Amino acid sequence: MAQKGQLSDDEKFLFVDKNFINSPVAQADWAAKRLVWVPSEKQGFEAASIKEEKGDEVVVELVENGKKVTVGKDDIQKMNPPKFSKVEDMAELTCLNEASVLHNLRERYFSGLIYTYSGLFCVVVNPYKHLPIYSEKIVDMYKGKKRHEMPPHIYAIADTAYRSMLQDREDQSILCTGESGAGKTENTKKVIQYLAVVASSHKGKKDTSITGELEKQLLQANPILEAFGNAKTVKNDNSSRFGKFIRINFDVTGYIVGANIETYLLEKSRAIRQARDERTFHIFYYMIAGAKEKMRSDLLLEGFNNYTFLSNGFVPIPAAQDDEMFQETVEAMAIMGFSEEEQLSILKVVSSVLQLGNIVFKKERNTDQASMPDNTAAQKVCHLMGINVTDFTRSILTPRIKVGRDVVQKAQTKEQADFAVEALAKATYERLFRWILTRVNKALDKTHRQGASFLGILDIAGFEIFEVNSFEQLCINYTNEKLQQLFNHTMFILEQEEYQREGIEWNFIDFGLDLQPCIELIERPNNPPGVLALLDEECWFPKATDKSFVEKLCTEQGSHPKFQKPKQLKDKTEFSIIHYAGKVDYNASAWLTKNMDPLNDNVTSLLNASSDKFVADLWKDVDRIVGLDQMAKMTESSLPSASKTKKGMFRTVGQLYKEQLGKLMTTLRNTTPNFVRCIIPNHEKRSGKLDAFLVLEQLRCNGVLEGIRICRQGFPNRIVFQEFRQRYEILAANAIPKGFMDGKQACILMIKALELDPNLYRIGQSKIFFRTGVLAHLEEERDLKITDVIMAFQAMCRGYLARKAFAKRQQQLTAMKVIQRNCAAYLKLRNWQWWRLFTKVKPLLQVTRQEEEMQAKEDELQKTKERQQKAENELKELEQKHSQLTEEKNLLQEQLQAETELYAEAEEMRVRLAAKKQELEEILHEMEARLEEEEDRGQQLQAERKKMAQQMLDLEEQLEEEEAARQKLQLEKVTAEAKIKKLEDEILVMDDQNNKLSKERKLLEERISDLTTNLAEEEEKAKNLTKLKNKHESMISELEVRLKKEEKSRQELEKLKRKLEGDASDFHEQIADLQAQIAELKMQLAKKEEELQAALARLDDEIAQKNNALKKIRELEGHISDLQEDLDSERAARNKAEKQKRDLGEELEALKTELEDTLDSTATQQELRAKREQEVTVLKKALDEETRSHEAQVQEMRQKHAQAVEELTEQLEQFKRAKANLDKNKQTLEKENADLAGELRVLGQAKQEVEHKKKKLEAQVQELQSKCSDGERARAELNDKVHKLQNEVESVTGMLNEAEGKAIKLAKDVASLSSQLQDTQELLQEETRQKLNVSTKLRQLEEERNSLQDQLDEEMEAKQNLERHISTLNIQLSDSKKKLQDFASTVEALEEGKKRFQKEIENLTQQYEEKAAAYDKLEKTKNRLQQELDDLVVDLDNQRQLVSNLEKKQRKFDQLLAEEKNISSKYADERDRAEAEAREKETKALSLARALEEALEAKEELERTNKMLKAEMEDLVSSKDDVGKNVHELEKSKRALETQMEEMKTQLEELEDELQATEDAKLRLEVNMQALKGQFERDLQARDEQNEEKRRQLQRQLHEYETELEDERKQRALAAAAKKKLEGDLKDLELQADSAIKGREEAIKQLRKLQAQMKDFQRELEDARASRDEIFATAKENEKKAKSLEADLMQLQEDLAAAERARKQADLEKEELAEELASSLSGRNALQDEKRRLEARIAQLEEELEEEQGNMEAMSDRVRKATQQAEQLSNELATERSTAQKNESARQQLERQNKELRSKLHEMEGAVKSKFKSTIAALEAKIAQLEEQVEQEAREKQAATKSLKQKDKKLKEILLQVEDERKMAEQYKEQAEKGNARVKQLKRQLEEAEEESQRINANRRKLQRELDEATESNEAMGREVNALKSKLRRGNETSFVPSRRSGGRRVIENADGSEEETDTRDADFNGTKASE
């Protein structure tokens, strides 16, 4: 990120100081000290340097205080190099661990950098102070920038979401999550602020009257909602006590068109009660502190301490003034459009809520009834709310309630009255809040423009753990659980699922962050029900309490892992839930009340009838059922997306909130989420302090580390092939050959051309995936490439424009010279008399003819005006008729609207009654079900009592059996003690032999613990026998009490049932009445519809007449416009002709004067004129022929071009059709490829499962071997068995050690060894179970005895006729007591043995703990090494990428050098060429200069001769008298001299012209030379500077590359050292593997002896494989058929979708027709045009309808084929089932053979056990392999049958879908037929529109032709005039010679006037001025 010198004050909180980070001193210090992170109790982690390594421990020196500490290797974490300090994206860290992440966040936080990227999301730490990073300047900095171009900021997140919404056309959401006080609300406000600036809807608009109104209101909505919904809590001074989802709608161009706010769960209980040091909602304090005196008197306000509902009085907020905030809130409401009356009404309601708290009730002396001794507060409440005081107090103290069908008054107690007032206050405030929200939404959504997409911002209460957590905290924490689960699912599950779906190489990583168990604990509906479901269930029962709810919750969810019962119970209403952020203790007191939210009906009806309109509006929709108040309408108005389901159902607060949350989660899942994780640094709300453990806990809970890890290891950026090719093909322009190419193949070629590292990307099925930062790098290169291309294009454009401007200047220069010459000629010509005469006479020639034409045109115009007036009168009449018809139509529509509204109200009432009836019926059914359950339970109790008598008879026998069992137990105890002593000795021996027998000790410990637990159980049972009798007696009494209660409840239920039946009959009668009313309304509606149809028919006739009239009017207007155009063209032609007439007249006058002057040369001049006229006519004819041929050629070229265009369009259509076919084929091939890939994956997984099960079976074979060898012996052979187990444990421990050595590379071996170890544990546990069977039987007998004793005691109290039997049992009990006393003595002995065993157990546990600690240490080392390996792999990838980037830069550098060399050589060549041209032009200039000098010399010589001749002529004239005789000769000589002089003049003029031209050329050459020289010098200088700059830049880059290479060498050296270490470990492992291989070879030698017996097994295996292959073949065929059926189904679905689209298009056309009909009332012309267009559309729709009918027939054929194929598949399934049964029989036969082989094997094992133990083990392994193969066959057979069942199911689903599609197609057909009638009406309109457009095009073409002809004729006239002028000039050259001759004397004698005239005429007709 570019830094611009010194950072400004606000940029210091955004940018990092790179000078400190890139310090080489810090880098060297880090490398020298070997810095690491070690755990710290204060700071979480502390920096230290490694001093010494001692095995598994490391001695480190703390950097802060220099203290040396010894820590474990597993506890230290690597430190990143200093260049990664304060890194902006933590995914760039080299060593990713908790310490590095915490350190980076801490460093940035202390530097004022609160935003940090963490992979794909952003982490924000609350600064607890104001930072200058939210100004308009910062907004402009982030506007339109990419993420990597600017530092982290909430503006960057908002801009990314905004740009993604516009580019991808996908809805976006920004989720700010975190604990309470972390800064979610503030960041939400910043997002809205940024969007209001960037996407302002008034940008670029001219209307400034509404500038930014919507944006202002959007920004001001937050202060209003915060004032009424936020409060101060312990953790946060501005805590949102409600959740909100702000949906900002944007149009297609990205402007804001509206917004909507949805709220969730306002904590309304805060309005009446607050915890210590907390406040209620802000508006209460704002109002009391900021209201003026008048307002205080109007609102009846008092001091803070005078209100009971303000529990803590006035609690100030630091840095906030309540009075100022009140003014801001009032201003915000004014901006939102709240009137002053509405504001005052709102504040009155707020004040009334406070006054409700001041109402005090007292208990009367003799009764519990409540009374109100002082009603002052009540009077204030009633004054503010507009209700009667007496009615209000009566409703509170003695409300009227309904008992059955009667209404009675019931006196309330003090507690009930207090509760009613508090409930009223809460409900009033909640309704006020919802009204404000509805009003705000109405203001924000008043534009009524359709939004193309939206951006949602979620701000919801954060996770809360208070001292007392109630129902609101449960809902808030439940919401946060759902949001965190969405984050985990989006970041971890969906990301990896897409990798697998695209088929890229990826191993699925389970991050263990599933929160579903906790969510199900709260929201699960049944089996078992969750917290909310149980709470709703308890709300049904009238006697339910909070304690019963908690008890039921503990019984249902007591075993749930996320549910806990607190150990130290303060109250019986407490329970705990383990959330993702920690354990929360909830107190369920008053939860039932909060969930039901009851209200007093009497008070709500009073408020509904209030005199205050605002209060009445708040309470207008009260609907109460079963004690719950309903606010359905208000909820719908505030939540536009909420559906109108179950208006009258029993709806609890929990249910409503759960549904709202479900809709919110659905909305979020449909958007692309952008996560912002807000972190709270400390709980003291202090800036500059960061609690490390608090931040770490939040990072762990939020999944920050896992998110960074998957961002680093995964491929977070992805792009589809077509978009990648379209966007980045400019970077590899020549890589893709011309012609069609598959998108994937093209991307592969582009990747090769771009030379990307293969580790940086993966190519999937439809997308290409990139690691972090790769796409950003490609974007930068693309921007640079586009910049270069644009610069080159701009240079070419500027060059072209400069050349064009230069040519234009040259043309202007020559034109200026011509104009100057002509102006000078005109100045001399204007005083010529003949010219003046010509200009006066010429305009008078055509005046008479033009006047006649003007008169005719005026007559025609008058007629046209009359016709237009007539048409206008007709149009006015038609408009009057139309207005009458529209009025009639409006009246009919109003009547129809009123009737439909009446019908809708009746329908709504019917629906509401039906819902109430349904609710009551459900309650009745539930009561009946409970009644039946109670009856069943009573019958069960009677049956149990009958069973007791029979069971009592068997009690004596069971007691005797128990005594025998006790004796057996004592014997077993003695034997067990002996065995335990032996085992103790053997354990000591084993400790001496090997110190790694921890596993066996664990097993022995479990065995001993089982024995001790059994002994303890026996002791407890012996003690409890004395208490059994009392217990059973109490149980019987409780059962009798419960039975009586059940009988009472049954009677109550019967009464309720009768009552409900009566209500149901009343409802039936009401429903019948309503149905009769509905029938009457329907009849009236039918009549009105008939009248409306008749009116519409009349309207159609009127419209047709109007259309005809409009058609005539349009024709007349067209005719008028044609005439007007003809008139204009005639006028223009007349003016043009007059102008031409004047010009020709002037020319004619000039010609006449010239002809008069040139009468001397008559014959020759006439001949020349005739010749010239003939030449002119010939030229005219040739010109006409040329124009005609040119027009013909143009016409032919147009026809050819049109034909070529048609051919190309046909070819294009063919190519499109071919492309569509290829796309379909490609899709089918891709589907087949995906299916094959899926099959391959399934087979691979099956193979892995088979291998895994093979290993398990091998372990089971070993287990069977040990069981077969050890199970046959008696328990006396325990010592031998222990020795065997010792050997096995030794082998296992050896394998474990080997696995620990291979921990880095052989993790799978560790898993297999642990599985083997688990098998041995299970084996030992099974043996202990066999030894303890007797004790379990004893426990069973005791349990049976207990149950019988219970039954006995119950019968003693229930029946008196069994007293004798009870006395005998008492005698038996006394005997049993004696026996128990005897047994107590044995128990004491057992206790002594127990103490001894406990000591042994303690020793064993100590040894076990040591072994477990060693194992944990090994696990830690393994994990640490694995993390180091992962870091090394990441470093290696980074280094590879760095090397590849360096190589690419080197290649680019070489390429740039080569280009620079080429450019410099090219410029050198250009310079040489320019110098050569300059030299040539200089030589030409010199030669021209010499020629000019020669011409000047010749001119001077001619002038001298001329002067001499003049002198001679003067002499001759003067001597005329003397030589009169020689006059004739003198005249001849004079004429000769004059001709010579004339020739000399012409030569002189020609020489002067040439001289002028050479001078001009010389000047141009000099100017061009100077310009070229200057440009060349500037280019050379710029090129030198550019080369110098590039050289310096390249030197800097080389220096940077050298430093980077040096770093890379160091890192490579470290990697090489690690590699050497790993290679050493590998060599050790290879040595161990060699020893294992030698042992394996020895086993193989012994195995070869028994290979003959294996051949039989192999044959059977081959048979089984053949049968399996047959099954697979048949299954594949079935799958192919199913795929073909699926393809047919897909085709049918596509056809159906096409029909659906056609239907939707028809609907759209229908709506457009309706709109056009409405618009026809104002403009008839548009309706006529639209009519013709729509008629053509109707024809097209008819054709599409016919095509759809054909498609439907084809679809029915396909359905028939599908049914036939389904029957065929069912037959094949039957055959497959038969083959499967055969395979099953074969498998059973193989299993029997396998059992026989096992028995043979056991026999062989008994025979040769002592000698060939190893060979038997090998045989058993082989047998296990065969068993595994057999089981594999069985599994494959099961998979085949499963796949067949799946195919069956798919086939049925396909048939059902086909049937549904057939029905839908029929519906579409009916809709299309209905649309035909409307569609035919539109066909005529489109034809008329086409005729109109053709006529307009014809007129346009006609005018274009006339214009072309006029311009051609004008050009021809101009050419003719020029030709005449040139002829006239040539004629004057000869005609003026005599005049000069005759005027020669005048030239000599007279003054200079005549000479000037001659010169003027010469200049005029020759074009150049002769001067003497």
From Swiss-Prot:
Gene Ontology annotations for the cellular component aspect, listed alphabetically: cytoplasm; cytosol; extracellular exosome; melanosome; muscle myosin complex; myosin filament; myosin II complex
Residue numbers of Phosphoserine PTMs: S8, S23, S40, S1684, S1722, S1954, S1971
Domain Myosin N-terminal SH3-like residue range list: 31-81
Region (Actin-binding): 661-683, 762-776
Gene3D superfamilies in the cross-refs: 1.10.10.820, 1.20.5.340, 1.20.58.530, 3.30.70.1590, 6.10.250.2420, Kinesin motor domain (3.40.850.10), Myosin S1 fragment, N-terminal (2.30.30.360), Myosin VI head, motor domain, U50 subdomain (1.20.120.720)
Function according to Swiss-Prot or TrEMBL: Muscle contraction.
Quaternary assembly: Muscle myosin is a hexameric protein that consists of 2 heavy chain subunits (MHC), 2 alkali light chain subunits (MLC) and 2 regulatory light chain subunits (MLC-2).
Protein name: Myosin-11
Organism from which the protein derives: Homo sapiens (Human)
Gene, per the UniProt record: MYH11
